[in-house]
Amino acid sequence: MIKSSLLLAFILGSLNLFAANPKVLLKTNMGDITLELDEKKAPITVKNFLAYVKKGHYEGTIFHRVIDNFMIQGGGMDKDMKARPSSKAIKNEAFNGLVNEAGTVAMARTSDPHSATAQFFINVNNNSFLNHKAKTASGYGYAVFGRVIKGMTVVNRIKKVKTHNSGYHSNVPVSNIIIKKAVKL
């Protein structure tokens, strides 16, 4: 009885080790982007992102900041450049060992290291200057929590769109790039 209980506990524990990382499909008006999220290295950030996906927050938001050779940012503004309400800010997990390289997804934030809510960005270049250096306001970095596993050609098309200034915002695409749907796969 004890042996079979131990064996069952071992098998169930082993299954957890090989559990697949969560994946999210972003359906945009320029094509689909599939993200794989690193739940082990960024558990707080992944839980936060998936909560926004589950409640439909990203549907109808746009990539509102696009800078070729840097990143594409979205998840917080609607097509009229109005901010979507967001939940409480989360702890910055930029010290997790993941780095801001091309194809990774990270949380956008203000100058406060622990101010990330819903906005995220996809790096289109290796942006090592965004990596964690120290647990200080200027050295904290931006928390990477996943990567693009399908649809990098879509990301590369988005990074090339024409942009302009819109009110207080710069690098805003002239034509809206809309996240039509975000679903956990």
Say what each PLM segment does.
Residues 17-185:
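Cyclophilin-like peptidyl-prolyl cis-trans isomerases
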Residues 9-18:
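Hydrophobic h-region of N-terminal signal peptides that target proteins for export
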Residues 1-6:
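Bacterial N-terminal signal peptides that target proteins for export
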